């Protein structure tokens, strides 16, 4: 069985070496992520030791956490001025596909990941799809953005046919590395491995919310075959 195969810790595997982390909650005191600047710097120092090259700070924006773009930009500038490490920092946001998002999209009041294209990191409920998901994603595209679906392996309502349909519609996928370690459960782990093997992921992230979470991730095991696949794919994620 797949879960009896040899494994290695995330730290020992070296899969984070050279990584661009496209999903994190390291901007302090703006959502359910890191609460203090000190904790942010502890995580960034450890990321630097692991060889992480760049981190996108992607705070939540949703009806329950209605962060304002200007406020996030100001907090990010303050953080970057205080940071003395070598990891490159950039600001974007993770958007829940809800009523607030529709308003922000209409106003073009958004924080995209500006890599080679303007990607919008978006998420849905883990259990229930939003109404007209595909229509919403197509509206994002019509505005000149590229939808980047956060941690698709975690959506219980999605099956392989759903992932294939989304890829056919040019929707990009972002892998949560913790999914490959079983931190979210074996079912999510298996889905993540299948999607990775199928080459469906476009970007990766750790979705770090706290010091404890990140340190635990580093000690978690990943199957060696999966680690090799991730390391090889990681070269194409940047």
Language model region names:
Residues 201-216:
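Short acidic/histidine-rich active-site segments
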Residues 4, 9, 218-238:
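Mid-to-C-terminal alpha-helical segments outside catalytic/metal-binding sites
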Residues 34-36, 64, 128-129, 155-158, ...:
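Acidic-and-aromatic substrate-binding clefts and catalytic sites of carbohydrate-active enzymes
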Residues 25-27, 60-61, 92-98, 125-127, ...:
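Active-site beta-loop-alpha junctions enriched in small/polar residues
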Residues 1-87:
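An N-terminally biased module of ancient metal coordination in phosphate/nucleic-acid-related enzymes
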Residues 48, 141, 196-197:
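Non-catalytic positions within long, well-ordered alpha-helices that form the structural scaffold/packing
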Residues 66-170:
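Extended substrate/RNA-proximal surfaces in nucleic-acid metabolism proteins
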Residues 20-24, 55-57, 89-93, 120-122, ...:
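Hydrophobic faces of well-ordered beta-strands that scaffold small-molecule active sites
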């Amino acid at each position: 069985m797949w879960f009896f195969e040899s494994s290695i810790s995330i730290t020992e595997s070296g899969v984070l070496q050279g990584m661009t982390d496209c999903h994190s909650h390291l901007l302090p005191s703006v959502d359910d992520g890191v609460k203090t600047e000190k904790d942010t710097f502890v995580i960034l120092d450890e990321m630097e030791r692991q060889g992480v090259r760049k981190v996108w700070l992607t705070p939540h924006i949703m009806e329950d956490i209605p962060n304002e773009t200007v406020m996030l930009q100001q907090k990010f500038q303050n953080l970057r001025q205080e940071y003395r490490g070598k990891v490159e920092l950039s600001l974007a946001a993770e958007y829940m596909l809800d009523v607030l998002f529709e308003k922000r999209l209409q106003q073009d009041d958004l924080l995209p990941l500006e890599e080679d294209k303007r990607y919008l990191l978006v998420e849905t409920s883990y259990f229930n799809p939003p109404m007209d998901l595909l229509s919403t994603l197509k509206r994002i595209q019509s505005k000149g953005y590229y939808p980047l679906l956060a941690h698709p392996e975690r959506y219980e309502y999605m099956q392989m046919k759903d992932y294939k349909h989304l890829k056919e519609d040019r929707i990009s996928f972002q892998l949560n590395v913790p999914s490959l370690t079983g931190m979210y459960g074996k079912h999510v782990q298996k889905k993540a491995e299948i999607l990775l093997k199928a080459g469906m992921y476009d970007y990766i992230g750790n979705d770090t919310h706290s010091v404890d979470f990140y340190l635990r991730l580093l000690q978690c095991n990943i199957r060696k075959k999966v680690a090799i696949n991730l390391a090889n794919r990681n070269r194409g994620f940047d």
